[in-house]
Amino acid sequence: MRLAIISDIHVLGPGEHEKDRELMDALSIGRGRMRSVGRRFLHRARRRFWNWHPESRRACFLKALEEIQLYHPDWVVANGDYAGDAGGVGLSDESTYESAAGVITLMREIFPDRCHFMFGDHDIGKYSTAIRQGGIRLASLQRGEDILGIRSFWQEQIEDIHLIGINSSLITLDFFLPEALTEEIPEWNRRRQQHEQQVTEAFSALPSDERVILFCHDPSALGLLIQHPVIRERKEQIALTVLGHLHQPHLLTLVQRLPRMPGWTPKYPVGRIMSEGLRSAKTWWHFNPIVCPSPFGTGQHVSGGVLFIERTPDNRILTRRHRVTI
């Protein structure tokens, strides 16, 4: 068994690239001394310490695909966040959809019938600090499922190992509902209930002598999954949980320490989502988590790459992060 995982690609298509350029121009101007300083700081932080230069993300993505081809995997899993989420509303934004569709189409061409695609938080929609608007949208979920073929839940079996993919944004739905459209909330709740039932049924049906490799974009979902009795009972059978979202593996160690700080609930959407998600970080380790880095890491190639998973003849499961350089 050979698996290759790529996550948090964040490639910008032509439409998002133009929006990003306009946004960066706006962030570098500002009015008033304090506002100008704050906006320039945000501009530099986005450029240098998180998403790096958008012009180079595609090069990192293409190089990552080359490295995956050389590995000859049985399955390739894309662990969410394909585009830049320029509008803060996920795939319902035309430019974001264009970016994500380009990524997914190319991967299917290179790895036909060997790809699984996951939802990331930015694919469904998430409030944007930069443009100060956005949130989850049902249209984004529907576009991803119906047009791009991203499944909220999927399962494959390779001998005695079950590969299970889940939609972390449905599990952590309460974190995002304050920014949802009011008329969509009942349908969101229905979809969450349906998704949780799929996940718990899969674990209930798991034979006691077989193992799971779980794929989950946002680690915040793990603290809610462990609350389900059937998952608590089966946690020893979870060989690995492959995470995305964090862009680089060292942040997993950092967030382990953050919950020890005094609890608080910020009113600002992004701060609130992070605070609520981190409260259960001490439970994540039940899932044997490992972070798949973004191909470009967190800027300037810091810990960027892809993740390889291999089963040895003596039934051990080995993981290896492979650095991507351009």
Enumerate the language-model features and the residues they cover:
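Beta-strand-turn-beta hairpins that frame and shape the catalytic cleft
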Residues: M1-A4, G13-H17, W154-S168, P207-R211, ...
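N-terminal active-site segment of His-dependent metallophosphoesterases
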Residues: M1-E94
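Divalent metal-coordination and catalytic microenvironments
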Residues: D8, V76, D81, A100, ...
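Active-site environment of divalent metal-dependent phosphoester hydrolases
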Residues: H10-G15, A83-G87, F117-T129, I171-F175, ...
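Active-site-proximal loop/helix segment associated with metal-binding centers of metalloenzymes
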Residues: G13-R47, L163-E210
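His/acidic metal-ligating clusters that form di-metal
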Residues: E66-D74, E109, Q157, H162-I164, ...
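Extended active-site neighborhood of metal-dependent phosphoesterases/phosphodiesterases
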Residues: L91-Q197, R232, Q237, T265-C292, ...
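Binuclear metal-dependent phosphoesterase catalytic core
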Residues: P249-I326
